[in-house]
């Protein structure tokens, strides 16, 4: 569940915070009436967070443990600014204002053609920073449609829309032409699904096809879940502070593997 409102239409900080309090209360009441478990509520700053920088309105409000800070990290994608450590450090500082809630960048990305430019490392750098600062992420979209409002002016300007997403789309027929394998290849990688204790580090070495993650403050007997983007053999896993690696589920060409903690500190390495 995502809730957001733009300060540029008149909300000041206190009003924005009050909005999120009301939104969270309404969501939790709906869940109670539906006999549903509490879902994660994503809350955002202004969609002009990139442009406004430190002047952005960052909501700070009373919440439960099921909230996630979700700014759109579009620097060097579609917005000005530099995509660097300072951006992600700022994100963590803003999350700390709400008690250190987890962070998920609700949107990020850029034109898919940049993924095939050998001189352009935008996608690799963004994912590297996500790992370094342990930020989850969702890209803008899976497949764009010709009728997307973002392209409303294109017919009048006589330009073909530059469609985002994993699929080439013909406009105006809106027919899928094909899958962008080169684009997908830059984004195809392992992802931690559940980590015991606290995640200490994540590193996806895409050049050498090696994934490493470590954690601390775990309790013995806790389960780690790791999604792998291709089939592996158990011999490709190196575990420290973990035991009993097992294939939990196959998802298309990918797999979810588990392991059980034996110590407070753990490390998992996968070589492809």
Q: Which positions does each model-derived feature cover?
A:
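Aromatic-rich peripheral "rim/lid" segments of glycoside hydrolase catalytic domains that contact
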Residues: 58-63, 70, 115-241, 249-272
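Extracellular glycoside hydrolase catalytic/binding regions
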Residues: 2-135
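Short, solvent-exposed turn/loop segments enriched in Gly/Ser/Thr/Pro and often Arg
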Residues: 1, 45-48, 140-147
């Amino acid at each position: 569940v995502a809730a957001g409102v733009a300060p540029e239409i008149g909300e000041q900080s206190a009003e924005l915070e009050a909005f999120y309090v009301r939104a969270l209360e309404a969501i939790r009441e709906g869940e109670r009436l539906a006999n549903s478990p509490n879902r994660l509520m994503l809350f955002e700053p202004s969609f002009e967070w990139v442009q406004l920088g430190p002047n952005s309105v960052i909501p700070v409000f009373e919440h439960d443990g099921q909230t996630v800070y979700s700014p759109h990290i579009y620097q060097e994608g579609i917005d000005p600014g530099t995509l660097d450590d300072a951006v992600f450090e700022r994100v963590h500082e803003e999350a700390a204002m709400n008690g250190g809630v987890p962070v998920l960048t609700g949107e990020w990305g850029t034109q898919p053609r940049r993924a095939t430019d050998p001189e352009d490392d935008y996608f690799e750098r963004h994912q590297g920073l996500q790992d370094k600062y342990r930020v989850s992420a969702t890209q803008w979209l899976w497949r764009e449609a010709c009728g997307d409002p973002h392209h409303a002016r294109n017919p009048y300007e006589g330009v073909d829309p530059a469609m985002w997403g994993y699929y080439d789309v013909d406009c105006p027929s809106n027919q899928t032409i094909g899958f962008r394998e080169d684009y997908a290849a830059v984004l195809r990688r392992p992802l931690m699904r559940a980590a015991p204790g606290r995640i200490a580090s994540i590193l996806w070495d895409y050049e050498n096809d090696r994934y490493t993650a470590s954690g601390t403050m775990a309790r013995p007997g806790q389960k780690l879940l790791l999604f792998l983007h291709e089939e592996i053999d158990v011999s490709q896993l190196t575990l420290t502070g973990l035991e009993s690696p097992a294939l939990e589920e196959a998802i298309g060409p990918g797999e979810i593997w588990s392991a059980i903690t034996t110590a407070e500190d753990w490390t998992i390495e996968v070589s492809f």
